[in-house]
Amino acid sequence: MQGRVRGSGEDRISILPEPLLCHILSFLRTKDSVRTSVLSSRWRDLWLWVPRLDLDKSDFSDDNPSASFVDKFLNFRGESYLRGFKLNTDHDVYDISTLDACLMRLDKCKIQHFEIENCFGFCILLMPLIIPMCHTLVSLKLSFVILSKFGSLSLPCLEIMHFEKVIFPSDKSAEVLIACSPVLRDLRISQSGDDAVEVLRVCSASLKSFTLKRTDHDYVGNGEYTVVIDTPRLEYLNLKDYQCQGFKIVSMSEYVRVHVDVVFEVIGGTVLSKRNIICDFLSCVSNVRYMTISRRSLEFIYRHLELKPRFKFHDLARLRATMFSNSSPEMLPVILETCPNLKHLTLELVHDSLVTEGTSGLLTVLPRCLISSLASVDIESPITDKATELKLVSYLLENSTTLKKLVLRLNQSCRDKYEPGLLKQVLQSPRCSSLCQLVIL
């Protein structure tokens, strides 16, 4: 009995109540939902009861196909029935008739979930914000879109705002769009290289998650690009920015989780100016308890921040870091020295033959956290027989007085060749902590 009720010719899905069937159809594109109408007489008009349209311009052949389809749907169900609308298109800024025509039909609809996805990343759609629709929006997702200029705006119900390569009319418009959303909780911005915003202000009393991505190298802005974050309830902050001249964090939750992949760009700046910018940024996140930091950011900070006394993250309890395995013996003790109360460390070691090995740090630095707080270390990348990696493991085992667990992974590609020797060397390493459990995966 697969898909059919025993003793009858009716399949299991068809006997489900219509509200549940409509909910299932809501996860399909409208084109696929319409195709189910040929299954039986019961399915013929079922797709019309799905309060969501997911359209793709490539599915139509006429000049204004999407708008005509929307008209027919609204005439059948009524303007107040539609709750979700998504349009996939491939048009550029010079051919926006499809988008404009669809938006005109949605003017009086109480849309809660609205999404525009431009299939061609190099093309940009010009999009106006429709004021009546804004009052009911809960989720707004735009991809490769130029926002038209707007004045006062209100998004009283908006909780989710995801912008992929969206171009704002001005600095002020970006600030207003965020500030006029009093219940916003999830904000993701991936800025376009054509965006002229120079000061991005993220001010929200309700925001809990903020992701910023800015990795293009050619930007039209001529001034210093900075980010100002004033989000007292923020619980997750993900920064991936390779062109920033500065961050200013006014407020965020003390329990915030921070993911840092940042490289500061100071055009014509001195080494001291770079250090000052880095110190300002580190001061902004000095009270976080959980941090993930990329290899790029770690190398950049380590290279430019040769200050004494070194900056301290007194509240940091969990750290996940990526670094070159060749330079890890020199870098790791220095990084750990900045985290005197660290309890959990996760490492990803990346091998690069162009990076020279460093060992002096291991011989001279004994960070405080190794003596007083570090309880677990998880090395996510497979351990090989390279001297630096084995020395790193020995260093942690021999100097961590409070270590309770060390998790290692063997290199699967060379397990047969190196496993016996690796295990023997690791197991024979002296352990400072008698409670340390060695886990080999």
Curated annotation (Swiss-Prot):
Domain F-box span(s) in chain numbering: 10-56
Gene3D superfamilies associated with the record: 1.20.1280.50, Ribonuclease Inhibitor
Limits of the FBD domain: 366-410
Domain of life from the UniProt record: Eukaryota
UniProt cross-references to CDD domains, sorted A to Z: F-box_AtFBL13-like (cd22160)
Listed InterPro entries: F-box-like_dom_sf, F-box_AtFBL13-like, F-box_dom, FBD, FBL13/AtMIF1-like, LRR_dom_sf
Pfam families: F-box, FBD
Protein name stated in the entry: FBD-associated F-box protein At5g18780
Species annotation: Arabidopsis thaliana (Mouse-ear cress)
High-level lineage: Eukaryota, Viridiplantae, Streptophyta, Embryophyta, Tracheophyta
